[in-house]
Amino acid sequence: PYARKAGDYVLRNATGYKLPRKLKVAFSATPEDTACATVNDMGFIGGIHEGRPMFRLWLAGGMGGQSALGLPYDAWVEPTEILYYIEAMIRLFMAEGDYENKGRARTRFIPRRMGVDAFMECYKKHLREVRESCSFEGIEPEIFKEASWDSEADHPWMIPQKQKDLYTVVLHPLCGQLFIEDGEKILKMISEIPAAEIRLSMDEELYVRNLSKAQAEALLEAMEERMMMTKVRMSVSCIGTPTCQVGVNQSQALCRAIERAVAAADMDETRLPRIYISGCPNSCARHPVAALGFSGCRIKAGDESIEAFECHIGGKVGMDTSVMAKKAGVIPAEKIPGMIVELGEKLSEEKKSYTEAAADGTAEAVIKKYCQ
C-alpha cells in the first residue's frame, strides 16, 4: 500500500510544488531491488529490522546525464512515516535544486555541489521541519498470514505466489511491443478467472497473477510461440526513433536484429544476459546499471554519419550491491547482432555464465573486437 499512498499524496499536492525538474520515488519489496530504488531520486527497499518490517532509504540517485547511485540514509524508516520523508525530499529539492541549468536540475547534482555530509544534514533539517509542520495519517499495512507451501512450478516463467496453489506467469513480447491479437488472446484466456489480474513490470513484461497451476501451464503453452522465453530475447528497448522526438537511433530495430541473429545462429542462448538498449544517452532503458547495455550515438564512416551504440558492461542493481556499468567502447549498430552471437558462442565454449565472463574480462575481450 505504500507506493500507492505515496503516489496519491504527490499527485494530490502536485499543483503546490514548483520543482526544478522531475523527482522519482521508487519502492522495492526485496533486496533484488527490481524497481531500482538505489538509483532514483528517492528509493525505499523493504527489509526486517529488529524483527519488524521497515524500509531502507536511498536519496539523490538517478540515471541520465552523469548518472549516480543513491546515497544510503543512515537510519531505518517506519513504513507508516514514509510521507514525512517524501515531503522532506520535495522541500529540499525546491530549496536547493538548480532552476537555471536544466542539465543539472536533478537531485543527484545537489550532493555534488554541497558535499554528501552537508546534503544529508540539509535533508535531516527539512525532515525535522516537516515533522513539526505536518501531520500525516498512518498507512494501514497489508499483512500476509498464509503459511509457506511446496510449489510445483516447472517452467522458468511460472512463479509460485505466496498464496497457496497460485502462480504468476511472466510474458514478454518482443521489444515490449504487445500485438493487439496477442493481448486479446491473453484477455480471453483469463477473463473467466475472477481473481486474475495483469501487472506490468519495468522490464516490459506482463505478470499474469492468481492462476492455478493448470491455468498457468495453459497460458504459457498458448503464448509460447508469441512471447520471448530466454533472457537475451527478453531484452529491453526504449521506443527510440522515429517515435521519440529526442532519440538518436532506432533502438527497437537493434533489439529485433539481435533476436533474429540469435535465432538464426541456432546456438545455446541461455548463457546470454538480458540486454538494455537506449536509443540515446538518456537512460529510458536503464543502460547505466545494465550487465550489458547500449546507448545510441552517431559516428563518422567516411563522409557519412551512421548509427552506433556505446556499450556498457558490468552494471548491477541490488540493496547495497548496486554498481554503475563501465563504458567498453562504441560499436556500429550493424555489427552488434554479430557481436552478441560471438559472445554467446564464447560463453558456451568456455562454459561460463555472462556474469563470470564480465568479471574475468572474457566478455570485454569479445566486445572490444567490434569497437571503433
Task: Name the predicted role of every residue range.
Residues 94-162, 206, 210-219, 226:
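Terminal amphipathic helices with adjacent charged low-complexity linkers/tails
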Residues 317, 347-352, 356-372:
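Radical SAM enzyme core and accessory elements
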Residues 33, 44, 48-51, 149-166:
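N-terminal basic/disordered segments at the start of proteins
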Residues 67-75, 157-177:
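Short glycine-/aliphatic-rich beta-strand segments at the starts of folded cytosolic domains
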Residues 17-124, 290-352:
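Mobile "lid/hinge" segments at catalytic clefts and subdomain interfaces of large enzymes
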Residues 1-54, 84, 172-304:
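Small-residue-enriched alpha-helical segments and adjacent helix-cap loops
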Residues 56-59, 91-94, 152-157, 188-196:
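Short amphipathic beta-strand starts and helix->beta connectors
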Residues 7, 23-26, 136, 140, ...:
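Non-catalytic interaction/regulatory segments
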